[in-house]
Amino acid sequence: MSFSRRRFLTLGLPALGISPTFAQSAGNAPQLRFGVIADPQYVDAPEKGTRHYRASLAKLEACIAELNQHDLAFTITLGDLIDRDFKSFDPVLERYAKLKSPHRIVPGNHDFAVADADKPRVMEKLGLQSGHQSLSHGNWRFIVIDGTEISPYRYPESDPRTAEATKLLESLKTQGHNNAQSWNGAVSDTQLQWLEKELTAAKQANQRAIICGHFPLLPENDSHRLWNAEAVVKVIGRHPHVAAYLNGHNHKGNYAQAGTCHYVNFKGMVETASDNPFAIVTCYEDHLTIEGFGPEPSRQKLS
């Protein structure tokens, strides 16, 4: 299994009301660390193009063995534990059970690529009562948004919500949106209001926030973006204490910055036969560092 540590990407974080800086504060002690995995997308099927589905089990084992050597507050998977088929979950979750740190999961589009009869069972299988969630770790609040909430794949075909999402998708296609793709999705107005409340509560508690989702929000030319990415970016833009938005979905990875928020798209584990991308994020008072493994980039030009 091939992975190696990559050099650090240092992301400067502004203090509330203070302009951002990429300068690392040498005196800062780490406040917490967490692991990041994106798109294992396992299924017992032959490789297709650059996607090596079966190899993801061995990659997960190697990744988890490495993560277990670090003192992590938690590890988060940014969606798509499986590629398809409900039976694919068990082998994947057996590997995750070896994690020493708590495991947080973001639901992804492929996690619902199961038979209609199994779709209502997916969230329970992932141990999720809700796709969107919030948890605090000291001075940090981690918020997960659920971009599968409005989508043509989340619910059985007979569910009215599937027809509503399909209608929205066709409207977006008619309007020429590059992210009007059936494998994307959207968050509801109710979830947007919840996000606003969570970010306001974080500010009142003097916490910085990191938001995690499956779908990218930026850059605008990425066809993998959430259908209503602009609405989420607008909410984030009102809250300068949001340090970063972390996501998967686009297996190539990506990076953007808007205002004081860093938008980091982590590479998909399912890509390539042996290269194994994952990362460890370390949170300091005024910056983040991302330690990439395997092909996960260092993005050193931002330092």
PLM regions and their residue ranges:
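N-terminal export signals
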Residues: 1-25
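N-terminal active-site segment of His-dependent metallophosphoesterases
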Residues: 24-90, 190
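Active-site neighborhood of phospho(di)ester-bond hydrolases with catalytic His/Asp-centered motifs
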Residues: 37-38, 75-79, 104-109, 210-213, ...
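Extended active-site neighborhood of metal-dependent phosphoesterases/phosphodiesterases
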Residues: 87-205, 231-241, 256-292, 302
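Alpha/beta-hydrolase fold active-site loops
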Residues: 32, 73, 132, 140, ...
